[in-house]
Regions:
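Short, glycine/charged-enriched hinge/interface segments at domain edges or termini
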Residues: 58-166
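Short, low-complexity N-terminal leaders and the immediately following helix N-cap/first helix
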Residues: 1-66
């Protein structure tokens, strides 16, 4: 009989070569990646909302004071997965935006829904303070960028890796 220590040594020295294979990403969970996997997209594709709320241009809040709130006109709604918003953004415009919604050009900041004060007619929101630029924004490519290694060779595929296979 072989001792425990000797058997460990034999197993450590043994080399088993398993053939590489190409499989569908849906079948890759708990499999070992044989080469580095590179992203072929930026993810997220565009700047998007980190929270449900309202998109604004932070410059429109310069000089605002608690005693003198400014009305921002609600011009639409943006859901995650929607095509980019094409409306022309004017000064003091805002748009409702859901988490993951792409932020249209002209807006640069998200105010979370919990912080929103609506005008009585619900066609406007009221803002009474300076809002910092890029608050609650997830930037394009912040998870991973095109050409970046997203899964290293010899990594066991986990659920969070599968999105990178797009």
């Amino acid at each position: 009989m072989i001792s425990y220590e000797k058997s460990k040594t034999i197993l450590k020295k043994a080399k088993i070569k398993i053939k590489d294979e190409t499989i569908k990403s849906i079948n890759s969970l708990n499999r070992v990646v044989s080469t580095n996997i590179y992203s072929n997209i930026n993810y997220p594709a565009g700047n998007n909302a980190a929270f449900d709320g309202y998109a604004i241009n932070s410059k429109d809040t310069n000089g605002l004071k608690k005693k003198f709130p400014k009305k921002f006109k609600i011009i639409g709604s943006i859901a995650a997965g929607m095509k980019p918003f094409k409306k022309k953004i004017k000064k003091f415009d805002t748009a409702e935006i859901m988490t993951g919604g792409i932020i249209p050009k002209g807006f640069d900041t998200i105010i979370p829904i919990e912080q929103i004060i609506f005008a009585p007619n619900k066609k406007y929101i009221l803002i009474d303070q300076k809002i910092k630029k890029f608050d609650h924004v997830r930037f394009a490519g912040s998870d991973y960028r095109k050409g970046e290694v997203v899964i290293k060779k010899n990594t066991i595929v986990q659920p969070n890796h599968i999105l990178a296979f797009k």
